[in-house]
Amino acid sequence: MKKEIKKLLKNSPLYPFLRSTKRTLRIYKEYPQKYGVSPIEALKEIEVCKYDAPYILKKATIKNQGIGDFFYSLDHSIVVEPKNTIIHNMPVDYDYVTNLELGDSVIENSIKAYVKRINDPRVTLEKPHDLKSALQSILLWNSLLWQTGHNLVGLGRLDKVLAKYPIPEDAEELICDFLKTLHCEYTFKSGVLKGDTGQIILLGGLDENGEYFCNEYTKLFIKCIEKIHLPDPKLLLRCSKNMPKELMELSMECNATGIGSPLFSNDDIVIPKLIDFGYEAKDAYNYGVSACWEPLSIGNSLEQNNLANVEYGSCMHQVLVDEKLSDCSTFDDVLNVFYKKLEGNSIQIKTGLDRIVWEDDPLLSLMMGLKSDIAQGGAKYNDYGILSVGMSAAVNSLLNIKKFVFEEHKYTLKDVQKIVLDNYQDSADDFSLFSENANGYGTESDEAISLTNKIISKTETFFKDYRNKFGGKVKFGLSSPGYLMIGQNCGATLDGRKAGEAFQTHISRDKGEPLTEIMNFESKLKFTGTSANANVLDVMVPSSLLKDNVDKFATYMMAGIKSGIFQLQMNVLSYAQLVDAKAHPEKYPNLIVRVWGFSAYFNDLPEEYKDHLINRAKQMEHIN
């Protein structure tokens, strides 16, 4: 590869595009202007190889890119394009992996040969004996996964993994260098958008005795993430009403910097749902997450939790443009038409799930200690996970139909159908009326909560009996990265959303209401194990407000955990700052924002994502 091209590609998002045929160049429409090379020219310089871990490890050029005293190597010239789908988007159990004694299989011998080629005393296959050697061992195994084409590689519960090692005087420096080393290949590791690496570290959590686990490593990781101030890796704090408030305060101080970490997950709610889904208690209490927030069992599961989207908003649009809509004589008739569209969507999803063929994976199977390959059903849990988009659009559209058509009789069904088909053109009053949603999704309205729960329950009936070819089940959740991309391909809905506009992000309501209102809404949603695949409350908070009220927000969050929220993430930002950053990017090279389940530099985002965040911040701050 030409040296100048390689240098450009190291800092551009072309490698992630190559890793999956699902990527599109639409996101990179400004690629030539931004990176000084056309995608076609850049593609010519890349050698794509099939998935063959021993071959890749033999071929890979070794060059240390680690920070401080750590060794870390990834060869940029190797991009893996598998025949089938590589299993990824999950952590391994690094406590098991770093203590693994290798045997004499092909994959084990290839790992030993790779380590021998590294030829560095820091990198061994011996069991770690202290913090430094444990972190180095994690980095080695982590790099093997990335090098062989696995994406969205999580880190698991590192405070628990490292608990056995005494904390040395230089622990903070070591952990900071460890995090920086993981970040050093930020672009190479990114998925659809720059920053979407899946490098998530879990901290804290309930144990099987109902006691809350945390230690000095828990606090150190939070302090170090705040100190290095990078968008990646990211943290998820497993929370409980039994957790110490000072740990929540420390987490709020970290979030106040704007880096979007940690995300919060409520063990008091999540763990019982996972047991209800079918996990053994010991696995439920030791749960991890996929790349963003989707719960799974660490180290013994196939669980791929981002395989499809239930498209509530798109189903609602289909109802609104259906010629038979005007035949409905009651609200229940309309609701049943919606359910029929939803059932059709679920059938399409299940058909798609059945078509997936997984790539045989001797490396991942080894790292899980499986007797048969994970791609052939060798894991303890072989479940799937799907996400969903547009629940707020569906709920608010249905509530508007109920109120304005069947209760107040201001419109007929033909009237609202025309408004949607016309995309609110010349209907400013209608747009204003349907956009209000004063008692809609995200509020404490009993009607909105009841309707949301009905739709959740109905969705569960469509999926609860599904079994994949390994006998695994499927769970869904009310969060998804698809709120913008799917919205771009969906017509108008009757909540004031116009054709092509984004859907609401996860469980959110950007109208400036108190944080407690949206928390109370989510805490009243009736999830089961089938609907436990990430239900993230996404809140926008003015940066100045959080910085000046860390203790108060910690109290709010503890109350939310006690009331029963599922998960929560914070985007701490300022409308004025975002507008200025878009106009003058050179002034804000380090401005970090939260996207769907990851953080990224604002300047790295495509324009439509910048605009979406700006619009959300504008609504949140009540700016006209």
Regions found by a protein language model. Give the residues of each.
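Conserved catalytic cores of very large enzyme subunits
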Residues: 1-120, 124-624
